Amino acid sequence: SRGLGDVYKRQTCSTAYDLDAKAIITVTKSGFSARMISKYRPGCDIIGCAMDEKVCRQLNLSWGVRPILLGEEWEVFVLFERAINACKRDGLLEKGDVTVITSGVPIGRSGTTNMLKVQVVAD
């Protein structure tokens, strides 16, 4: 039997495929979500947004994951906005791109991925 977390990872990849998303953005405390999404080899970029430099370095070893350091933040929608802005800054996303964002709430607790959001990148 698969756990609920695995269902979220598979659904994230399926949603990205169905919407022809440019990227999957995973806001992650430990990097686990980004690593688990990478095992499904989605056909789009995986951007692992971490709050810790050590986690970013570890994500460099995961297939298809592009790590971005966000720094600490405990408000989920502020983190999402910072993640989108960092991706635009680094040339990974531009206006009109569809993204699938995943995270756990409450922020900062490993193993709690329970949120999936589809967002079209604005200006």
Model feature map: region roles:
Residues 1-8:
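Short, small-residue-biased leader/transition segments that mark boundaries at the very start
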Residues 10-24, 28-42, 47-98, 104-123:
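ATP-dependent carboxylate/acyl-activation modules
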